Amino acid sequence: MSDYPSCALRLEQVARRYRSGDQELVVLDHADLELRPGEIVALVAPSGTGKSTLLHLAGLLEKPDEGRVWIGSHDAGGLSDTARTALRRDHLGFVYQFHHLLGEFSALENVVLPQMIAGRTRRQAEQHALTLLSAFGLQHRASHLPGMLSGGEQQRVAIARALANGPAVLLADEPTGNLDIHTAETVFSALLSAVRNQNVAALIATHNPDLAGRMDRQVTIREGQIVPA
């Protein structure tokens, strides 16, 4: 493994186990993974092999039983819950299969809110949100509520929201899994363009081999190890 300053995300000898009755299920067994700044990696693990667990560990939503998770030069091990939340807010972005937009807020407001939580003024946040929405071709939909948007538009707003605070790492779990083929292609192309333009490292789970093939490399989970796909 490389020294951490050169990595946007680093999982070092990470182990995660769960108990089911009297049995212990080993999901990750001292596994390693690193993403360099701007690197886009496809996670193509089948369902049930630990894909969600890996994303949760990388996103600081779960703690490993053993090993360390680094976000840039920050070691997440031993941090308080408050410090982990701040690290996640300031350095990570998340995109899910379902957009999880706040239905009572407009597209613009959904992208503004995380910025204001991070400390930007409303004016700064709105200007940046409009820039992001414009990059996704949504400037004319900024005032619309999520329910007034198409599925593809909703997901593009969700991606803009994930990138609003300038994360070092984007974690995406089947970001096009709920879309038809044509819309999925449009959304995925927009996602790739955005992360490349911002030099964001990305770990993107997908079952679509065509989309996976457009990323820099592919990994899977096999017998508790993260290995090339």
From Swiss-Prot:
What is the top-level taxon of the source organism?
Answer: Bacteria
Q: Which SUPFAM superfamilies match?
A: P-loop containing nucleoside triphosphate hydrolases (SSF52540)
Q: Where does ATP bind?
A: 45-52
> Where would you say this protein principally sits, based on its record?
membrane
Q: Which UniProt keywords apply?
A: ATP-binding, Cell inner membrane, Cell membrane, Membrane, Nucleotide-binding, Translocase, Transport
Instruction: Please give one Gene Ontology molecular function term for this protein.
Output: ATP hydrolysis activity
- Its Enzyme Commission number? 7.6.2.-
Q: Which residue spans traverse the membrane?
A: none
How does the entry describe its membrane topology?
Answer: Peripheral membrane protein
Annotated ABC transporter domain ranges read 9-229
What GO CC annotations are associated with the protein? plasma membrane
Q: Record's family? A: Belongs to the ABC transporter superfamily. Lipoprotein translocase (TC 3.A.1.125) family.
Provide the assembly information.
Answer: The complex is composed of two ATP-binding proteins (LolD) and two transmembrane proteins (LolC and LolE).
| This protein's name | Lipoprotein-releasing system ATP-binding protein LolD
User: What is the organism field in this record?
Assistant: Granulibacter bethesdensis (strain ATCC BAA-1260 / CGDNIH1)
